[in-house]
Structure formats: structure tokens, C-alpha cells
Amino acid sequence: MKDNGFLKNEQTENILELKLDEINFNLEPINGITLENIDIKKDLYKHHELLWKGFNHEGQAPLDEDTINKQKLMLSAPHLNPLLHVVAKNKCNEYVAYCGVWFNDKTDYVYVEPVCTIPEYRNKGIARMVLMEALKRAYDLGGIKSYVISDSNFYKSIGFKQHSHYTFYWHNR
């Protein structure tokens, strides 16, 4: 490849796969936590703040018009099905975890992106709960397998298995 002008990049992607007909979707409820699908119009700010905290950003989530417009654009993606975007709420109705999965009925697979939990609710099984609920809903719609770009033990503990690994090369012109 080097002779053809390609340079190896440090970036790689690891793809994990889970066959949805091989998993048990029944999880014990977690006291004080309820699940529901995201209401895109009503929950824009709550969703943005959850992502901000869930991905370990410092300080308050920016709520300026440009940021919120980008959030609206993301949540208006053509194949976004709100039923497949599951949030966990605490007793105060605050979002504490989120899982988005993407499924198009012209395919047989589900793509997981993203999954996050705010720091004070981590290691309680909530991320697993929102992921499994989202995957169950996608399975009910016809999804057969699921993919995630990750090498995290979190996904492996649920049953995701190694599918593929990619190394990126850039063409040096």
C-alpha cells in the first residue's frame, strides 16, 4: 500500500456484533429508575445535558442557539426512530442514562450509538438496562443482529463478540 501512496493512520475501529435472538432481554427493574423513549421535541435540552454529562464534559452544558440547533439536526436524522432511543429517568424525572440504536427495516441489523450514563449513576446496571430495552425494541421490529464500534468490556459482558477490526490508511497525494 505504501508503494501506492497510502500511509497508515493511527486511527482504528473495532466492531463488535451481538446476535439478538441469542440474548435474554428480561432484566430486573432497578428501583427508582424508569425507562421511556425519547420525546425529541419536548426533551431536547434534557437530552443534550445528559450527553454532556454522560461523556464526561466539564461544567455546564452549552445551551446557546448554535449548539441547540446542532442537537435538533442530530435528532432529526432521516432514520431516527424515537422508539429506539431509550432514556432512563430517576424519581425526580431527570435523565440519567441513554441509548440510541438505529435500525432501517430494509436491513437486518441494528447499530448502537451512543450509550452513556451520568457519572453519579454509573455501575448500577442502568446502561445495560437502556441498551437491552433499545435492542429488544429493535428486535421486535425485525433486527437480527447488532453492531457497535467499541472495544469496551461493557459490551462484551452483555455478549457482543469480535466481528472485525479496521485500520485506516490515508492517500498521500
Regions found by a protein language model. Give the residues of each.
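Acyl-donor-binding surface of acyltransferase catalytic domains
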Residues: 1-33, 167-172
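Conserved active-site tyrosine of GNAT-family acetyltransferases
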Residues: 1-2, 6, 155-156, 160-161
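A short beta-loop-alpha structural element at the N-terminal edge
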Residues: 34-49
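A conserved beta-strand-loop-helix scaffold within acyl/acetyltransferase catalytic domains
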Residues: 58-116
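Extended non-membrane alpha-helical scaffolds
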Residues: 85, 135, 164-168
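Conserved acetyl-CoA-binding loop-helix of GNAT-fold acetyltransferases
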Residues: 117-119, 123-136, 140, 148
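Conserved beta-strand-loop-alpha-helix junction that forms the acyl-donor binding cleft
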Residues: 144-156, 162, 167-173
